[in-house]
Amino acid sequence: KRLDRIKTTFAAFKFDWKADCDHVLTAIAVKKYNNPELSWKVQREAYKLLEGRAGCRLQKRLENLRIRMFWKRVPNEEIDKMTKMDIIAADKRLTEIFINIIREMALKYDV
């Protein structure tokens, strides 16, 4: 049973990796905190791991993106919608590292 779960975890994240990551993070929140609404805590943990492993600062990248969008006269509604996940999606290296972190977290918390 555990081997099947490991296979499923590593086979996931092919088509819509953002939705898959969100699903896994919510499942970890349920397992760890018994509350799916606390998935933001798990997401914060994943971001910290990503920043450490990739040697990047997501918040600074997000601020820089918002400044560039402002100078390109992008509407404020679109600027406000930008998230750290958008930063990760824009960089293939960060995307791969983040997916691997989520896989490791899924195995760690047995989700």
What does each model-identified segment do?
Residues 1-111:
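Positively charged, phosphate-engaging catalytic surfaces used for nucleic-acid and nucleotide handling
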